[in-house]
């Protein structure tokens, strides 16, 4: 019996020698077993290497195993495994159950124990403790020695509690991977196949105490053990840190040899004549000097090392791809001669896939993938949540959108639209859908019979979809009714999946993926059913008789899924191997690309997110309890890992980093880059920031990738920027390739694309817009804001998906409707405004809103507590608003003439008719919230227009001038015209106002109610324009003084209108009305000419794009020459009037 040690620095050929020795042993006529033991994640690569090494017809005597697999081999021969084995999935589910049940007893971890990530961390910690032979008893003893009440002590109390309960749960019934190893230790001496066997252990930097005990047992059983150590046997002082962990591991193994008096043999590959794998000089220099202090500098010219700085992550990966193509084409490399590693593979993974596919580089990403985003897992978890949470929208459509339900994609979208529009959830799914199909809606007087029939058909369709969705759930719910055992729920869940025919649907989907050549996803999804069944098996094996609510069951199941990873097998051998730097184990490679060498990525930033922090682990080490790695050992391991990676290739090393991330935020280079600069005197960092011709030439690789660069460069040429002549040669190549003809033409068209269209023509405009044109004021204002926005709204007419929620316009409509109904109630009860009391005001508001709420938007106001509170708030605001308006009436002489007055072809008041130059007419229509009238024998007849606003609205004459705010003027015009014709008397404008519906908060030191009310009334003062006539103003507010609390006006002590008042004489009112009519005519004519120009206004810092829903459609970009704002200047009132007068004069001339 002997232990052999193979020593050598990275890349000296230790693994190569081990494989050579196994090959030679296989050629001998012996029957003893040969085993190569490697870390679990490297078994596949080691098997490949072993097969590739052999030139024999068979290798039955040789096996590649991990220590876990060795345990299974032992148990298959001698038995000894009387307990049920559980994997990481089972452990996670048990720990989730234990943590949930122990929540009230936990101290530090009570809140975070509910989080998903906690169970994974707890599992890792328990694994570490078992691997280091630490029991709950030892932790308890340590706790007894800690007298003071520290956070560490409280943490250890929680950990000990959970660890002990976990062990108690397993005791006598179940065995995990760590217990497997302990059982392996107990059974090694009983195994016959290890008699006379030879073992090679390769690829380990260190061994846990548990594995050291395995090696100790093996050393007493097998003929000999050979262990490789990546270290220099007689390391100099400057290298001792680098090999510190390996040195400690070697000394532990050596102790075993000495303890049992075993023969020892040392093979040192660092001796010149034993070197088996020659490397290029640059790589050899990195291996020798990268981690040494002091170091030797490399002064020769550099041919096989490149450091590259990409302008961003994507650019970095594009240059990597171009260099890989270069190596394959110009240096004769095969794809599998190349590997790529990164410290931040998650950050690069999606970019890498896109770029490598664009460059036609075959690749394999060596990673264990989480199954949490797989649609099968989404289906199972959402199914549980549908029942446990009561058919919430998110759960229902997470389930339906997996593609495994019995509804098609179109049907899911139809059902989703209905559910969102009418707020369907909970019990509503178990009853026929009726919302939107109520009798009073279907039988509206303006509905045709055909529409009624369509409604009935829709109702039947939606209910048919509802039944097809809910039927399997009804059976599932029935099966688990009053069932509390996890085994029973799991069985019901499996039956539910069978009923949905999930396995066949999954296989069908896999075939579709295979046909579309998505082999990566084929590989993943062919494993998913077995993984799910494995989790179900673990549940029924270890938790079947445990009780759980459906919600708890879902959390336990999710914990199992979180622990589950799938490994994807390479689809071909000749491809670039991609992996994370910490777990990547490749065959012998010629070229290595190390990407993402940025600060915090490589070396890794300090992650201190475990259950025990680094300083707490250090504290335990001082007390003799070593739980896994400490910060110091982690840094040493990382140093060794980086050293191993940089030393891996034999011919070429590329190291790159990004100067910015995908969002453009600056990124710093790693300290490793500075190290390279010091080691290599002639090193020059290349970059694509300086885009020289050589760098551009380097990127001309494949037709797909090059096409993009060609387009970018020709775009620069079109924009009068410098471009290398070679790009015209590239363009010439594409122009001669028939397969690229269509894309080339599209590219040329795109280069000269103008993001603008001005007119679509009169005929198209007439076909788009209904004739005769009946226009609202808001439509005209939208055109004035931007013709294209008007075209989309009233021409294309896109519809937003309706959702069961209140928007600001809905709330505004509710206010308007309630105020309209309020006035109707006053009429019904024959109450005059001047007679209305505060009590009656509040009573009517309560009544009106209570009657409106149940039917408003299908009862949305009663659907949640939040909306029910909003009803209370709406009542409060409405009471304040109505009482304020009542107060206005009481303080003035104007009397409300009408509310919600409709002017239009079918309205109470005729429309405003504007005749256009081509003979067409525009009929202006609208609804006026309130019109007040003053009939005075001395002063005449005056009208006051009030528009209610639920939000803030300032009145601006400048906006009126530009057509952005013509609503009040049009309303005034409609009333003046109709009333004068109707009564054959002259009607004068009294004022136009916005009234904000609000119950504002005020800051005041006053405690007298009347004074507070006065402050509130100031806040509710109407905004707009009043006639510049003292008598009329006083008849709007008899109590007016220096400032009115009703209208935007005030009087001086001489009883004159103050300068701060928003007031105009009647002739200016008329001038404004005429100007608005001219504007309407101009807008109408442009509308019918087909003006759809993308031309939003810009006024100061404000633009009409700010609240526009169509910015994604027009794609307006001010940096384009043909996309420019219509700049308008903010005008003062006198400037507006002066311009209007000048324009009127020109018209007359």
Swiss-Prot record:
Record has Nuclease as a keyword: yes
Keyword Transferase appears in the UniProt entry: no
Record's keyword terms, sorted: 4Fe-4S, ATP-binding, DNA damage, DNA repair, DNA-binding, Exonuclease, Helicase, Hydrolase, Iron, Iron-sulfur, Metal-binding, Nuclease, Nucleotide-binding
Domain UvrD-like helicase C-terminal: 273-586
Cofactor note (record): Binds 1 [4Fe-4S] cluster.
EC assignment: 3.1.-.-
Listed GO biological process terms: double-strand break repair via homologous recombination
GO molecular function terms attached to this record: 4 iron, 4 sulfur cluster binding; 5'-3' exonuclease activity; ATP binding; double-stranded DNA binding; helicase activity; metal ion binding
Domain UvrD-like helicase ATP-binding: 1-276
Additional comment: Despite having conserved helicase domains, this subunit does not have helicase activity.
Protein task: The heterodimer acts as both an ATP-dependent DNA helicase and an ATP-dependent, dual-direction single-stranded exonuclease. Recognizes the chi site generating a DNA molecule suitable for the initiation of homologous recombination. The AddB subunit has 5' -> 3' nuclease activity but not helicase activity.
Protein name per UniProt: ATP-dependent helicase/deoxyribonuclease subunit B
Organism of derivation: Alkaliphilus metalliredigens (strain QYMF)
């Amino acid at each position: 019996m002997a232990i052999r040690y193979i020593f050598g620095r990275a890349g000296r050929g230790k693994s190569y020698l081990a494989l050579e020795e196994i090959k030679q042993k296989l050629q001998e006529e012996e029957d003893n077993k040969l085993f190569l033991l490697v870390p679990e994640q490297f078994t596949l690569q080691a098997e490949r290497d072993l097969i590739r090494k052999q030139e024999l017809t068979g290798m039955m005597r040789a096996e590649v195993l991990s220590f876990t697999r060795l345990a299974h081999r032992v148990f298959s021969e001698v038995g000894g495994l009387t307990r049920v084995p559980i994997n990481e999935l089972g452990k996670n589910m048990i720990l989730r159950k234990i943590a949930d049940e122990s929540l009230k007893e936990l101290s530090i971890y009570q809140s975070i124990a509910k989080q998903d990530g906690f169970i994974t961390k707890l599992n890792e910690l328990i694994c570490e403790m078992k691997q280091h032979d630490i029991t709950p008893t030892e932790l308890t003893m340590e706790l007894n020695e800690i007298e003071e009440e520290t956070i560490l002590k409280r943490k250890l109390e929680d950990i000990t509690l959970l660890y002990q309960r976990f062990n108690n749960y397993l005791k006598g019934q179940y065995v995990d991977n760590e217990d497997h190893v302990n059982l392996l230790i107990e059974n090694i001496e009983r195994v016959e196949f290890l008699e006379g066997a030879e073992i090679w252990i390769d690829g380990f930097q260190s061994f846990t105490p548990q594995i050291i005990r395995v090696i100790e047992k093996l050393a007493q059983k097998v003929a000999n053990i050979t262990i490789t150590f990546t270290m220099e046997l007689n390391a100099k002082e400057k290298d001792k840190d680098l090999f510190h962990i390996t040195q400690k591991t070697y000394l532990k193994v050596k102790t075993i040899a000495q303890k049992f008096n075993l023969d020892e043999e040392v093979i040192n590959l660092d001796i010149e004549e034993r070197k088996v794998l020659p490397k290029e000089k640059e790589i050899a220099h990195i291996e020798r000097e990268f981690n040494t202090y002091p170091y030797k500098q490399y002064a020769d010219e550099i041919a096989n090392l490149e450091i590259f700085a990409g302008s961003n992550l994507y650019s970095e990966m594009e240059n990597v791809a171009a260099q890989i193509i270069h190596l394959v084409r110009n240096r004769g490399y095969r794809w599998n001669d190349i590997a790529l590693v990164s410290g931040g593979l998650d950050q690069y993974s999606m970019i890498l896939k896109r770029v490598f596919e664009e460059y036609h580089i075959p690749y394999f990403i060596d990673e264990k993938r989480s199954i949490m985003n797989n649609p099968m897992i989404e289906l199972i978890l959402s199914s549980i949540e549908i029942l446990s949470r009561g058919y919430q929208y998110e759960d229902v459509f997470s389930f339906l959108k997996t593609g495994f339900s019995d509804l098609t994609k179109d049907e899911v979208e139809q059902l989703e639209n209905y559910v969102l529009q009418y707020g369907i959830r909970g019990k509503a799914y178990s009853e026929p859908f009726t919302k939107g199909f109520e009798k009073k809606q279907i039988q509206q007087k303006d509905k045709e019979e055909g529409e009624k029939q369509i409604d009935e058909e829709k109702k039947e369709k939606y209910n048919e979809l509802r039944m097809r969705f809910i039927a399997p759930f009804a059976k599932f719910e029935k099966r688990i009714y009053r069932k509390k055992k996890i085994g029973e729920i799991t069985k019901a869940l499996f039956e539910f999946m069978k009923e949905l025919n999930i396995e066949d649907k999954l296989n069908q989907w896999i075939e579709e993926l295979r046909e579309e050549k998505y082999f990566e996803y084929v590989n993943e999804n062919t494993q998913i059913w077995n993984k799910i069944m494995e989790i179900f098996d673990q549940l029924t094996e270890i938790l079947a008789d445990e009780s759980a609510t459906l919600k708890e069951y879902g959390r336990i199941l999710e914990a199992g899924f979180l622990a589950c990873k799938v490994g994807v097998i390479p689809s071909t051998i000749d491809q670039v191997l991609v992996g994370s730097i910490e777990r990547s184990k490749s065959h012998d490679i010629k070229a290595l690309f190390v990407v993402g060498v940025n600060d915090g990525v490589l070396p890794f930033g300090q992650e201190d997110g475990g259950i025990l922090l680094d300083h707490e682990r250090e504290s335990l080490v001082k007390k003799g309890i070593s739980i896994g790695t400490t910060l110091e050992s982690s840094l040493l391991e990382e140093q060794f890992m980086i050293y191993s990676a940089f030393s891996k290739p034999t011919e070429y090393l590329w190291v790159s980093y990004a100067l910015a991330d995908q969002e453009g935020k600056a990124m710093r280079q790693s300290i490793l880059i500075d190290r390279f600069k010091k080691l290599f005197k002639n090193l020059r960092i290349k970059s694509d920031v300086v885009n020289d011709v050589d760098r551009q030439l380097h990127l001309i690789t494949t037709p797909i990738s090059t096409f993009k660069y060609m387009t970018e460069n020709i775009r620069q040429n079109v924009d009068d920027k410098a471009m290398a002549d070679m790009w015209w040669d590239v363009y010439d190549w594409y122009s001669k390739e028939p397969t690229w003809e269509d894309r080339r033409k599209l590219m040329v068209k795109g280069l000269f694309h103008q993001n603008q269209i001005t007119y679509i023509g009169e005929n198209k405009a007439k076909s788009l817009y209904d004739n005769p044109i009946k226009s609202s004021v808001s439509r005209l204002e939208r055109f004035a804001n931007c013709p294209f926005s008007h075209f989309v709204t009233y021409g294309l007419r896109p519809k937003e998906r309706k959702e069961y929620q209140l928007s600001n316009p809905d709330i505004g409509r509710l206010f308007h409707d309630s105020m309209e109904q309020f006035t109707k109630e006053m009429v019904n009860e024959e109450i005059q405004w001047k007679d209305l009391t505060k009590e009656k005001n509040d009573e009517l508001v309560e009544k009106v809103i209570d009657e409106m709420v149940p039917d408003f938007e299908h009862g949305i106001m009663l659907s949640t507590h939040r909306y029910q509170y909003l009803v209370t708030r709406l009542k409060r605001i409405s009471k304040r608003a109505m009482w304020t308006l009542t107060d206005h009436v009481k303080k003035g002489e104007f009397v409300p003439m009408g509310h919600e007055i409709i002017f239009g072809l079918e309205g109470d008041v005729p429309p405003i008719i504007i005749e256009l130059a081509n003979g067409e007419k525009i009929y202006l229509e609208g609804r006026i919230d309130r019109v007040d009238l003053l009939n005075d024998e001395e002063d005449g007849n005056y009208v006051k227009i009030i528009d209610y606003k639920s939000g803030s609205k300032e009145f601006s004459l400048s906006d009126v001038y530009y057509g952005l705010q013509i609503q009040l003027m049009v309303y005034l015009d409609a009333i003046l015209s109709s009333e004068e014709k109707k009564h054959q008397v002259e009607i004068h404008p009294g004022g136009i106002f916005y009234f904000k519906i609000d119950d504002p908060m005020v800051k005041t030191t006053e405690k007298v109610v009347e004074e507070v009310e006065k402050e509130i009334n100031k806040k509710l003062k109407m905004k707009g324009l009043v006639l510049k006539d003292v008598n009329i103003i006083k008849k709007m507010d008899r109590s007016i003084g220096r400032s009115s609390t009703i209208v935007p006006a005030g009087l001086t002590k001489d009883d004159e209108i103050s300068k701060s008042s928003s007031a105009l004489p009647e002739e200016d009112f008329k001038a404004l009305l005429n100007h608005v009519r001219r504007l309407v005519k101009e807008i109408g004519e442009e509308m019918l000419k087909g003006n759809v120009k993308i031309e939003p206004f810009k006024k100061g810092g404000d633009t009409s794009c700010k609240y526009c829903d169509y910015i994604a459609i027009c794609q307006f970009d001010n940096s384009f020459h043909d996309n420019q704002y219509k700049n308008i200047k903010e005008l003062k009132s006198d400037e507006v009037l002066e311009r209007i007068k000048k324009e009127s004069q020109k018209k007359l001339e």
